[in-house]
Structures are given as C-alpha cells and as structure tokens.
Amino acid sequence: MAEAKFEPAKDAIPGVIVMEERVKIKDDVEIEISQREDRRYEVTVKGPKGEVTKEFYYPDVYLWVEDDEVVIAATRSNRRQKAILGMIKAYIENMQKGVTEGHEYKLKLVYSHFPPEVKVDQKEGKVYIENFMGENVPRVAEIVDPENTEVIVQGQDIIVRGIDKEAVGQTAANLEQATYIKDRDPRVFQDGIYIVEKDGKKIV
C-alpha cells in the first residue's frame, strides 16, 4: 500500500517560527518538497543533468517552497537547531549544484615498484585494482549509484563525477579504502589511491 504524501505549508506548522534559512532556487532547477505521514520530508531537485532526492527529518524543523525559495525553519532557537538548518541548507545547495554543474572528485594512483592496473566496470558498479603491491587477487571498490556516478581512469589520475555529492564522495572514499595497506609503515609504503581534489578544491 502506497504511503500518503502531502505538500507542506507554512500555515500548518504547529508553533511559532523563530529561526529560518532560505535557499534561492536556480532558474533551471525545479524543487519539489513533500511530507510523509511520519513527518519525514522528501526533497526532489531536478535540473539539466538529472534529479536527486533526499529525505530529511528533524523534530521542530520544517521545509516548504515559497515563491522561488526553499524555506528551512525551526520553532526552537538554540545552537543545535541553527546547525541543523545550516546543514540542510548546504545539502539543498549541493543538490542544486549536482543537477546543474555536477560534482567531481579527483584522485591520484601512487605506486613505487608494482604498477597497478585500474579497471572500471560501470555496469557492475565496481572498480578493480589489479597487481596492487604485486598481489594476485585484485582489490575492489564499489561505485555508489553507478547509474549516476561515473569513474574515469586517465593513467594515474582517477576522476569520479556525478550529480549526487554523497555518492561521488563515498565512491572516492571507497577507492581510498580499497588500497589501504594494513600493518605497513605509511612513511615507507605510500602506494595507494588518494583523493587530491574535491569539487575544484585541492586537498593538501
């Protein structure tokens, strides 16, 4: 049985709004907000590159679309609520960026003696790192949401791009984790795959 959803409205909020954040909706973006019977908000952001949907639920926090803005409001005023409002605002801004520009992480394959070979199976949603540290069994990293997250290998450079920042970031983290070397001195054994750039910001 399908769960009922309804469009949230400011007038239906039980209490007085004491704090709010707003996100300007871009011209080429459509944002839909619905609320389930359990009060969880479902936010769908659609743009030229696709659409992303996320759920939000925090007590005393309310979301709705007002004209060309998303309003994120709270009926309590404290540091925690302020942080939650800021976090949701950042999520929605990242969702807008994803469906208009996309998100991109860059990684570097580092090795000293054994040149690994990185193979991407986009359909299967896996990345295979063969001959890593001379190992016979390939190491495997999962591509999160492979239909919308792409992994590209260009020599020792690896690019992860997609519309969902969380999926892109987690895929990059999976690649790092897959080549983690246990019980070895990292000052000596620096082989691995490392994130070097996140959405244009270099990692020192």
Swiss-Prot record:
Pfam families, A to Z: Ribosomal_L6
Superkingdom as given in the UniProt entry: Archaea
MF annotations from Gene Ontology: rRNA binding; structural constituent of ribosome
Cellular component aspect of the GO annotation: cytosolic large ribosomal subunit
Keywords: Ribonucleoprotein, Ribosomal protein, RNA-binding, rRNA-binding
InterPro entries registered for this protein in UniProt: Ribosomal_uL6-like, Ribosomal_uL6-like_a/b-dom_sf, Ribosomal_uL6_a/b-dom, Ribosomal_uL6_arc, Ribosomal_uL6_CS2
Annotated S-S bridges: none
RNA-binding listed as a keyword: yes
GO biological process per UniProt: cytoplasmic translation
Gene3D superfamilies: Ribosomal protein L6, alpha-beta domain
Function description: This protein binds to the 23S rRNA, and is important in its secondary structure. It is located near the subunit interface in the base of the L7/L12 stalk, and near the tRNA binding site of the peptidyltransferase center.
Subunit structure as annotated in this protein's UniProt entry: Part of the 50S ribosomal subunit.
Similarity section: Belongs to the universal ribosomal protein uL6 family.
Protein name, per record: Large ribosomal subunit protein uL6
